[in-house]
């Protein structure tokens, strides 16, 4: 028998406490469940506390349920890479192509839904931090891993980066990267 449809407002009434920094996500449909056929569906709240750019080998589907968010992306096909901010407003959808470095910036009192396709066995995700010095923009640190539990692994990598100043220091220019944006540093669209 199939489960009932998930009612987002009711789910948020009883479960919003599960949306905790740094990622603020909760997997409502986990890839380990046979019913999901490997898909991951997350409810994600704001504000989040992360500056990483996630690189996923599959496309990611974003639906902004409440408020607006900013999806920071990097186009690596140009030299130097081009940074582009994509606002996703309430009620809007966005499909991010596979292997696109992206940093989802979520603001206070916002809620979105993110769906990821099943990864191929052994597929490697990455989390990358770029230098915040606009004249540099080099990769400060990157961690690659086989993603088996998005709900816990992303948080662990963010915390690993946050807790190690050497990892946060740009080898090219010496600027220390932040693990989360300061209040007001990124303007909500």
Swiss-Prot record:
Fe cation binds at residues 54, 60, 102. Pathway: Cofactor biosynthesis; NAD(+) biosynthesis; quinolinate from L-kynurenine: step 3/3. Substrate binds at residues 60, 106, 116. GO terms for biological process: 'de novo' NAD biosynthetic process from L-tryptophan; anthranilate metabolic process; L-tryptophan catabolic process; quinolinate biosynthetic process. Catalyzes the oxidative ring opening of 3-hydroxyanthranilate to 2-amino-3-carboxymuconate semialdehyde, which spontaneously cyclizes to quinolinate. Belongs to the 3-HAO family. This is 3-hydroxyanthranilate 3,4-dioxygenase.
